[in-house]
Regions:
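Short, conserved DNA-binding cores of transcription-related domains
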Residues: 1-81, 85-89
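Short, positively charged, Gly/Tyr-enriched micro-motifs
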Residues: 46, 54-160
Length: 161
């Protein structure tokens, strides 16, 4: 099989370790290039690695196949003795994926917009054709999660957007 350019498949901020191309899916093993992370409680940057674990993230399809990111994530020890957070997991950043997400931010955004534009069943039907197998309920949950209510101010006018 010829070499495939995986650059566009990988969200920025991740480095490709290996690529497995199957008949139905492309699996990219990725990791963050830096081996340090800031403690979410105190903000001190730590390089003291505690352990590592694997996360699996679904991403946008490519070349007629599903794309799965197998991410090597790390846990670090906080180096501030007074911090109550002794061990923490590195944050990927909202441009890659949210804390406990199983989909990348760009796939989640596409699913959100499909659900917003078409609603439950029509969006689920189109998403299957686009190789994004999500249920109508997942589409509607994603729309609700992204929905931000704008509360009127005390004067009765909506806040500026």
């Amino acid at each position: 099989m010829s070499k495939m350019d995986v650059g566009p498949l990988v969200p920025s901020g991740l480095m490709v370790v290996s690529v497995e191309v199957g008949a139905a899916a492309i699996t990219l093993t990725v990791r963050r290039p830096s081996l340090e992370s800031a403690c979410p409680t105190c903000g001190v940057v730590s390089r003291r690695m505690h352990s590592r674990y694997w996360r699996s993230l679904a991403d946008l399809p490519s070349h007629g196949r599903r794309v799965q990111l197998r991410l090597e994530a790390h846990r670090f020890r906080c180096i501030d003795r007074h911090c109550r957070q002794q061990i923490f997991a590195e944050r990927l950043g909202c441009e890659i994926a949210h804390a406990s997400a199983r989909r990348t931010a760009r796939l989640d955004s596409l699913i959100h917009h499909l659900g917003l534009a078409l609603g439950g069943r029509p969006a689920a039907s189109l998403s299957r054709r686009l190789m994004l197998p999500v249920s109508k309920d997942t589409l509607l949950r994603t729309v609700r999660r992204h929905f931000v209510r704008s509360r009127p101010s005390r004067s009765g006018k909506s806040p500026p957007t």
